[in-house]
């Protein structure tokens, strides 16, 4: 089978969750209430995220972007992992519930990638508005999993073919539905807890050097073979 990588961004490629960092810096009290409602699942991730960014004025655009450029830290080994995928013609997709205005500039120097699927920011009004161009597909409508904004399982169904060996890399609860579709899950933090609770097998990682070692072993044992 041909390997294909679906990798989360916030808390996975970066050391911390950039949205949480951003909200804590600019609108801590207001965003905390929304975050609590999201964790308690009284509002959807999509509605919560929209409400958070609506707290920010578009006049803060440059300040917000600069803050994230200054504070976001790329996880150790990411460049080596991406280069390995590129050298072995392994499709590498970033699939994130984050937003284009900070994801794209942060990963630009590591590309090109096969694709970046994320939410988009509209700065044309007074407040920042999010546009969700990767919402849930018809398959998600069969279950109570809608409202996730950028729907990772829907992206996987759109991109992956039957011959692909799907590698999902993530850290949070928002990665779990994608993890259930994976042939192998590389997990850290909250995703590990959810995988253990619901008996989904995974391999833990701390840095992308760990991910690289796991993928190399898969290639060497023919669980996943290069496309060339």
UniProtKB/Swiss-Prot annotation:
Molecular-function annotations in GO: 2-hydroxy-3-keto-5-methylthiopentenyl-1-phosphate phosphatase activity; L-phosphoserine phosphatase activity; magnesium ion binding
Protein name (record): 2-hydroxy-3-keto-5-methylthiopentenyl-1-phosphate phosphatase
Disulphide bond pairs: none
UniProt EC number: 3.1.3.87
Record has Amino-acid biosynthesis as a keyword: yes
Pathway: Amino-acid biosynthesis; L-methionine biosynthesis via salvage pathway; L-methionine from S-methyl-5-thio-alpha-D-ribose 1-phosphate: step 4/6
Keyword Cell membrane included in the entry's annotation: no
């Amino acid at each position: 089978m041909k390997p294909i990588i679906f990798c989360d961004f916030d808390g996975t490629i970066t050391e911390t969750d950039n949205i949480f960092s951003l909200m804590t810096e600019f609108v801590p009290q207001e965003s905390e209430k929304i975050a609590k409602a999201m964790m308690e699942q009284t509002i959807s991730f999509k509605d919560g995220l929209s409400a958070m960014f609506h707290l920010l004025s578009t006049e803060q655009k440059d300040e917000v972007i600069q803050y994230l450029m200054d504070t976001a830290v790329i996880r150790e080994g990411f460049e080596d992992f991406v280069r390995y995928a590129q050298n072995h013609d392994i499709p590498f997709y970033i699939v994130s519930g984050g937003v284009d205005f900070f994801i794209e500039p942060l990963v630009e120097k590591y590309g090109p990638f096969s694709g970046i699927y994320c939410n988009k920011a509209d700065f044309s009004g007074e407040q920042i508005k999010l546009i969700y161009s990767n919402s849930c597909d018809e398959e998600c409508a069969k279950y109570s999993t809608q409202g996730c904004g950028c729907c990772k399982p829907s992206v996987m169904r759109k991109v992956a073919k039957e011959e692909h060996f799907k590698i999902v890399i993530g850290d949070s609860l928002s990665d779990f539905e994608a993890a259930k579709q994976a042939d192998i899950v590389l997990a850290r933090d909250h995703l590990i807890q959810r995988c253990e609770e619901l008996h989904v097998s995974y391999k833990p990682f701390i840095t992308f050097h760990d991910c690289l070692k796991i993928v190399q072993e898969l290639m060497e044992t023919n669980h996943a073979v290069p496309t060339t």
